[in-house]
C-alpha cells in the first residue's frame, strides 16, 4: 500500500483550505437575512454644495401606537435610537455645521431625545453599533431642533428640503411629527 507524504507546507495549506471551507458556511448562515425585517432598512443621500450627506436607518411603523408622549413608545426626555435595529448613522464627506454648530467630516450614530417643544439631536462618535448601545461619553455634538406637525407618515423616514449650493434641511418624519435640522 502506498504511503502518502505531505511536506509541512502542503499539510498546512491543506488544513487551511479545509478550515476555510468548514468555516465559510457557518459565517454565511450567521450573516444571512432570509426573513424580511419588520422595520426594513433604508438610506437617503443628498449632495449639499460639494458635501455628500448620507443617512442610513431602520424604518419602524406606527401600527396604531402612540409614539411621542410621556407614556408613548418613544417617551419624552429619553434617548431614542431614532429608528429601529442598528443605530441610525449620518455621514458627512466634509466638515459641516448642524443647527449652526460645527461638526467634522465623518460618520456618526444619530440619536435623539424627543420633547413636546424641543428635540435634542445627538451625533455620537461610535457609528457601527446596535441602536440600544448608546454611550453618552462618545457624544461629539448635541443641538436642539423644534418639532413641527406634518402629514401622517406610517413608516419613519428621513429626507432633505430647501437644498441649495450652501445648505439644506434634513428632516426626520414619523407619524405626524417632523423634526427639521439645518445643515
Positions of predicted regions on the chain:
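Short, functionally important structural connectors and interaction interfaces within domains
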Residues: 14-15, 40, 82, 88, ...
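Hydrophobic alpha-helical segments, principally membrane-spanning helices and signal/leader peptides
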Residues: 9-10, 34-35, 85
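Bacterial N-terminal signal peptides
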Residues: 12-21
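Sec/Tat signal peptide C-region and signal peptidase I cleavage site
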Residues: 23-28
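Bacterial N-terminal signal peptides that target proteins for export
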Residues: 2-13
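Mid-length scaffold segments of soluble, non-membrane domains
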Residues: 79-128
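Primarily secretory-pathway and cell-envelope proteins
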Residues: 29-74, 78, 127-183
Amino acid at each position: 500500500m502506498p504511503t502518502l507524504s505531505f511536506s509541512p507546507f502542503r499539510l498546512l495549506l491543506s488544513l487551511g483550505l479545509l478550515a476555510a471551507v468548514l468555516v465559510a458556511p457557518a459565517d454565511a448562515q450567521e450573516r444571512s437575512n432570509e426573513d424580511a425585517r419588520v422595520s426594513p432598512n433604508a438610506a437617503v443621500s443628498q449632495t449639499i454644495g460639494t458635501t455628500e450627506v448620507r443617512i442610513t436607518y431602520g424604518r419602524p411603523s406606527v401600527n396604531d401606537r402612540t409614539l411621542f408622549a410621556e407614556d408613548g413608545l418613544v417617551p419624552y426626555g429619553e434617548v431614542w435610537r431614532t429608528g429601529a435595529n442598528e443605530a441610525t448613522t449620518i455621514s458627512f464627506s466634509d466638515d459641516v455645521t448642524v443647527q449652526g454648530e460645527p461638526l467634522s467630516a465623518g460618520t456618526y450614530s444619530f440619536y435623539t431625545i424627543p420633547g413636546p417643544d424641543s428635540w435634542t439631536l445627538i451625533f455620537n462618535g461610535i457609528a457601527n453599533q446596535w441602536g440600544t448601545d448608546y454611550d453618552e461619553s462618545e457624544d461629539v455634538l448635541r443641538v436642539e431642533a423644534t418639532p413641527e406637525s406634518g402629514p401622517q407618515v406610517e413608516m419613519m423616514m428621513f429626507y432633505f428640503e430647501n437644498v441649495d449650493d450652501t445648505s439644506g434641511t434634513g428632516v426626520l418624519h414619523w407619524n405626524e411629527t417632523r423634526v427639521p435640522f439645518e445643515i
